[in-house]
Amino acid sequence: SGYCGGTSMGYADLYWINNYNSSFGNEQELRTLISTFKEKGIGTIADVVINHRKNVSNWVDFPRETYKGETYEMVSTDICSDDDDGETKKWADKNGYSLSTNKDSGEGWGGMRDLDHNSENVQKCVKAYLDFLLNDLGYTGFRYDMVKGYKASFTAQYNSEAKPQFSVGECWDSSNTIKSWIEGTKTDDALQSAAFDFQFKYVVRNAVDKSDWTWLSKPNDDKGTGNNWPLVNTNLDQGKYRRYAVTFVENHDTEVRPDGSSNGPLKKDTLAANAFMLAMPGTPCVFMKHWQKYPTQIKAMVAARKAAGVNNESSYANFRSNKDYYAIVSKTNNENRLLAVIGNVAAIEQSVNTQQWVKVLEGYHYAYYLPTTMETAYADLSTGIHQGEQ
């Protein structure tokens, strides 16, 4: 994110193009980071905040920026008419400004100006911004923030023109709402974006909190009997949306923050939670703090996933499960590729056919097995058992 007018994580976006001296470094450092990753075969995803925007000095002014010889500047009429529940309009009327005649096309958000994406000028500015991110800074794709704040069709419009290699939207809601958002990004019969699988995160949280691993196979509700299934779960439209599911077990909003606030944090079994995620279909997103704390263990899980060929269109089947453990077999092209055990590994070992499976990885409350017939250079890390609550 560009300069936000002070110390900021980037959520209060102000500059989109001409000022990248942010809380995390300057523009050249950002360019070096992106290019270094690219040299290593790693794409960098930009956090794109276009639901709302901060102002320069009053309620309705925005920075003037230049890109490819053209000037871009939003004006007061690019702000939704019902921004801040009418408070912005009161200020504008009092100070001689006009807002858009259009109401917000999605949910409102207080504190900054909600942008009217029906405005041709807003669309022009957003498209220039996305082009700058991809073709000037060198980003690979986008993580769209708060996509419930504007119609999904605008994401479709922006992506179909920008053509990012990867796109994911933060639609923090039930799976039915997330499904509707994904479908809303369709252009020419092609879906334009993935979405974070929030119910996957909360199902893992439920299993950990209840010390009952069978909850990994249940929907996210108090009794585990409803329809709020994770996107990757077979019970949700036969797994139709797992290709568009970005799974995670923790993020910056759900974790316990320094001030003590949280939204369903993962309190223990961090490694087991990541092992489950990395054995499942979908596109897994490892929380940075988990990687920083357990780089060796998580790197081994990623290596096993890659060796097994598990991807975002793989399927899975229940192998064995009870309160103490949950075991699945992940499949690609209908072939058994990875057996993952979450929970009490010792309790299930006698049920694993060692003529078919070889254990390649084991830690506290998790183990991975690969088929004995699979030719792989994957190292046996089964001795790397990590003791203690995670």
Regions found by a protein language model. Give the residues of each.
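Acidic/aromatic-lined carbohydrate-recognition and catalytic surfaces
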Residues: 1-109, 115, 148-169, 174-175
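Residues at structural and domain junctions
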Residues: 108, 112, 116-119, 144, ...
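Active-site-proximal helices and loops of the catalytic beta/alpha 8
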Residues: 4-12, 18, 34-36, 41-42, ...
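Short glycine/proline-rich turn/loop motifs
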Residues: 103-118, 136, 251-258
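Residue-level marker of alpha-helix boundaries and capping positions
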Residues: 23-24, 120-121, 264
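Alpha-helical scaffold elements lining the catalytic groove of polysaccharide deacetylases
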Residues: 117-129
